[in-house]
Structure formats: structure tokens, C-alpha cells
Amino acid sequence: MPGRTPTYKLPPLPRLKVKKPVIKQEANRCLVLMSNLLQCWSSNGHMNPVCEKLATDLKACTSQNVMGSNQKPRKSTINYHAARLYDRISGKPHD
């Protein structure tokens, strides 16, 4: 069949691996509260009673996280799932 273009296959990979997986980190709650408090103060004036709830929330948040969180940073699971599902996505022929 001279009219068909040849199809090229990629060489098989020993494993599928992402070198630097990016984990979406959630925003620090205390930083969000502090930003809201500063914005409230700039709009309403320093120590305005309108901003009192934000100030107490920020104090509570910072007292809970005095020494930082003891949680380890989460590892990405992309490489685990890529290895687990490699047979399905590598294009191997079916039974």
C-alpha cells in the first residue's frame, strides 16, 4: 500500500515517572485572616469594632499554630498511580 504513511511507535519506557510533581498547597488560613483584618482596618480605621471578630479569629489561629504545624508535607501520588496504570496507558495490546 504505497499511499499509506508509515506509523511510528515510541520505544517502550521502563516506567512512567514524573520528575517534579507539583502538589497544590492550600493557602495558610492565618495569612488569609491577617490579610482580611488589615483590609478591614484600612477601610474602617484601626481597632474599629467592625473588625473585632477578625482580630479574635486571627488570635485564635495564631495561638493554635504557635510552633508551626507538625504535619509532614504531603508527597505526590502521581508516580504511584502512573506505575499502577502504566499497562492501561502504554498502549499494550489487549488479550
From Swiss-Prot:
InterPro entries associated with the record: CHCH, Ribosomal_mS37_fun
Q: Motif Cx9C motif 2, which positions?
A: 51-61
Molecular function via GO? structural constituent of ribosome
Mitochondrion as a keyword of this entry, yes or no, is: yes
Q: Which residues form the signal peptide?
A: none
Q: What is its main location?
A: mitochondrion
**Where would you find the membrane-spanning parts of this chain?**
none
Cystine links in this protein are C30-C61, C40-C51
Q: Its GO CC terms? A: mitochondrial small ribosomal subunit
Domain of life, per lineage: Eukaryota
> Which residue numbers delimit the CHCH domain?
27-69
Give the motif span (Cx9C motif 1).
30-40
Which controlled-vocabulary keywords does the entry list? Answer: Disulfide bond, Mitochondrion, Ribonucleoprotein, Ribosomal protein
Q: Which Gene Ontology biological process is one annotated for this entry?
A: mitochondrial translation
Q: Where does this protein reside within or beyond the cell?
A: Mitochondrion
Q: Which family does it belong to?
A: Belongs to the mitochondrion-specific ribosomal protein mS37 family.
Q: How does it assemble?
A: Component of the mitochondrial small ribosomal subunit.
> Per its database record, what is this protein's job?
Involved in mitochondrial genome encoded proteins translation.
Record's protein name: Small ribosomal subunit protein mS37
Organism field: Eremothecium gossypii (strain ATCC 10895 / CBS 109.51 / FGSC 9923 / NRRL Y-1056)
Q: Which gene encodes it?
A: MRP10
